[in-house]
A protein has these predicted regions:
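Active-site proximal loop and beta-alpha junction motif in alpha/beta enzyme cores
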Residues: 1-130, 137-184
Length: 184
């Protein structure tokens, strides 16, 4: 089916139960993407005096993805980052940006597949449990660094699969309610 969003109409396909991803799994065609220079930005790592190199990805909204590699082993694990404080990105992006921190957990060039762990600080609201466009931006950055097109990425809200081609990106995961609010 089709779903209208601020980023345009997205095509969703129900896949049912998918091993490793859960029940009520959907695949969303997230559309075209644009990537800037790999590692063209510097990103402060909140709660430390360190920084990492980040890659700009436009998914219809701006992202800078920082892959925390072995060179940053003395810095906190992705799970331990302090994302209460907003990361600073240089050069500055006028419209602000979401910032993703990612660790590559496993990669298999023979299978064209990899696994990673990610956390995201979204512009205007801080850390969130997940971010669909952020997951896609992360997979696009990982593809640029490794040549691998298919990524299973774990965020605090769950595990999703992202498949990248030169033309577009697809996001696959379960539809899960993570919270309810009541407006007074």
């Amino acid at each position: 089916f089709r779903l209208g969003t601020r980023a345009g109409v997205k095509v969703l396909t129900s896949l049912g139960d998918v091993s490793g991803l859960g029940k009520d799994v959907f695949q969303v065609e997230m559309g075209a993407w644009k990537r800037g220079d790999v590692d063209g930005y510097e990103v402060t790592i909140p709660g430390t005096s360190g920084s990492a190199r980040g890659t700009f990805v436009d998914m219809g909204n701006p992202h800078v993805v920082a892959v925390l590699e072995d060179a940053f082993a003395s810095l906190p694990n992705v799970e331990d980052l302090d994302l209460v404080t907003k990361p600073v990105v240089a050069p500055e992006i006028p419209s602000d940006q979401n910032v993703e921190f990612v660790r590559i957990d496993e990669q298999s060039e023979g299978d064209d597949a990899g696994e990673a762990t990610m956390r995201v600080n979204e512009r205007g609201c801080g850390e969130t449990l997940s971010c669909g466009t952020g997951l896609c931006a992360t997979a696009i950055t990982l593809r640029a660094k490794t040549g691998i097109d298919h990524w299973t990425i774990t965020v605090r809200g769950g595990t999703l699969r992202v498949d990248v081609t030169d033309e577009d990106v697809k996001l696959t995961g379960s539809a899960t309610i993570v919270g309810k609010i009541e407006l007074l």
